[in-house]
């Protein structure tokens, strides 16, 4: 593990040097003071994300570190393209130095513009709607609102939570379900920002229910974390289920990352299979098992739909359904791209979302 960490740090340092050297050469400023200042700033930026995660407790460091991570990732995608264009332009009569400086400035403008637009997509959720039919009886159609991956913490804070409550309540849901990653690893900062008090404003006649994800962690035991989250009037289903309104079965699984958890069939066996069954499972795995266990609808998150492209190509390869709706036999599956974000508050090729699900029954 130590060897792997050392190799990762060496590779990271080499990539930072590549970005830094490209920028330094591009600006064409041959000045010792500029070089020293440039190197110090680049060095501090390059360790800001690591320090923010390891040290913690600093909002400014966390913000800088996460935006640096986005800048770093986008630079690695854009710089090779720019340098290929510059190589081709060498065979023209254009002034090489002027072309290099112009290209560097344009690259920086493009990077900052993409970061700005990506931040807008991260903080401006859209509402995506689906209509499904479950061939079981229930007394009425349901308007269900689902959202996941809020990652409440330093960057997904009180204002983001307030907007969530406002937009969800405007949809007038009968039922609200939240399949995990409610917080971003740090319960203390969420409590400091009074997020759970804000979430208590969510309104649905049949209640608000959630399961936990891989980022819903706490230094204490899980009971303490669940108690804290449930102070928002949300019921957490932790490898357990319940009957809502005498006619709908809701089941929440432990996250896949916990390793040991009950099988879906063990959870559904506790209920009448004639009742509609909705499963909250943070990571979109084991659809065949869910269908065999009599589940009618699985809602998940986790993938963020890649968050920053081409990450969506990776999630598409890893998950059978990495975003949106997929039907497998009688099983309906819906995966959200998430309301929040992990790491940089940036989305490129995806957008933060709230999901509205209209369910029609044999009523």
Language model features with spans:
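Soluble catalytic domains of enzymes that build or remodel membrane lipids, polysaccharides, and related
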Residues: 133-363
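Short N-terminal secondary-structure initiator segments
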Residues: 1-4, 117-130, 189-196, 221
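N-terminal signal-anchor transmembrane helix
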Residues: 61-62, 89-110, 115-147, 153-166, ...
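Non-catalytic terminal accessory segments
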Residues: 1-123
